[in-house]
Amino acid sequence: DLRMSRGLGDVYKRQIGSNRILLNYITGVLPELDVYGIRQMTMEQLFIRLLYEDWDERKYRFHLLEKDDEKNAQKGNREWFHDLELYCAAYEQREISHEEVYLENTKTLLVGHVLINTYLREHPDLSMQSKILMLNEVLYSKYENEVLGKQISYPAKVKKALDKKYASFFGDGKWKTSIYDFYREFLQVQAVAGKEVDIPETSFDVYDLAALAYIYKRIKETDPVREASHVVIDEAQDFGMMAYCCLHYCLRGCTYTIMGDTSQNIHFRYGLNDWEELRKLVLTGTYDAFGLLRKSYRNTVEISKFANDILRHGDFAVYPVEPIIRHGAAVRVEKQPDATALLEETVHTIRKWQQDGYETIAVICREEKEAAELAEQLKSYMEIVDCNPGTTEFGDGVMVLSVVYTKGLEFDAVLLYDPTQKKYPADNGHVKLLYVAATRALHELVVLYHGNLSRILTDPVSKEKKQKVFASETLTKAKEYEKKTFTQKEIEQQRRTEADKERNARSYIGPERIEVSAPKEEEPDLSLIHISEPTRHAQISY
């Protein structure tokens, strides 16, 4: 596993996971760690929250992006985010006027090209609507200073019209376009550029939601809300850079702890297969750190060896893992003559585990449909935990899950159900799926099947084949520093510096400071000046 920390603070506000089952599992562990007050949500739910009033749960819903959807998978990469950035920047350039503004009926320049561009350049973090409001305030203050300072008078109706004109010259601050229509227009532009994806109407995947949250924050928002001071992301490899770029923009000023394992990236086409891009995005501070959690405390030596043999079938690099020495039962791989025998042996194996005292048991299938059908069959023989991904609470008992929903979980015993060649062809994506399934087991792992077993599990790996390993030199150590003490004089100087910064910042959004000059001293009456010899000192009497 990997742990990536950015500015670790005292307050944890958000825990982000890939699905509700994982979050419910984490929630059960947190009280044991004496950690309270943490809000947990999936990445989809977080982006929905960032849409605020623009999300209508009666009208819209979200769905999971299909794993084999190559066309829509391109929405998860960083290039897609870059395209969205450029599209929003071009839109802002068109919407915000850059023309010089003169006081009506005069040649007095109120705001010029240079000033407008300076304000826009110096406030890149503001949304388009916030920039419009800022420019309106700057222009109106210039207008008021000009009119009041030079005592220019207008008829009441003219003055009222001018006030209205300059108060909303750059726009009224209310964006009338729907973020959904704006997003669909962006997707149409992408299609023309040869990057066609499905255009959603009322159902959105995580990358649609990420884009919508970015558009809201980048274009529409006028009243920013600080959602969190620290965010913890688990199973980070499941999300592509598009999600992280949008999250980084929407939660600016937030610190992060990001954890994951690229060997368990089951979304091979759009998840993270290495950490380089994410490191460059978030690890920018002096005391940010990137490190490895090498020790694996979950699996027995036998299960760990079986899982690592699966991993060696891939041609991708991995981070080396050091399992602790804990031996257990050998992994059992057993073929059944037909589907009926497969079901009977599944029931027999589960009952034996229950007799042995195992409290958490998982039967792992390839797809959700297969898991649901098998769960219905097993209910005739034993009690099965409800495994609805949206509502399930992790707990004791027998769970029948698709491999996708087992990520991040661990069970006393795991039965890998019918992993045939058809379900798990020999490619990198399915290598990672089988690796995830195998590493869920704490004590016992059994593989039951009928038909042709996946070649990932049958084909031997050449002893000459070397597993690609990421270089350890890429790690960074968290920096240590001593707390610096300041003298009272240094503290006062810092306060004066901060006050100057605040005063300069306020000049952007309010009237300029009025410089008040000290009154000139009156010339003294020369009759009251007496020059005395020989010193010739001037003595002035008042």
Feature annotation, model-predicted:
Residues 2-12, 529-542:
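Single conserved hydrophobic/aromatic residue that forms the stacking wall/gate
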Residues 10-232, 237-246, 254, 273, ...:
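Alpha-helical nucleic-acid-binding subdomain
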Residues 479-528, 532:
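Intrinsically disordered, low-complexity N-terminal extensions of nucleic-acid-metabolism proteins
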Residues 93, 316, 537-540:
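Charged, solvent-exposed alpha-helical segments that act as regulatory interaction surfaces
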Residues 9, 20-28, 32-36, 41-46, ...:
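Conserved helicase motor core of SF1/SF2 NTP-dependent helicases
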Residues 15, 334, 359-361, 520-529:
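Intrinsically disordered low-complexity regions specifically enriched for long asparagine
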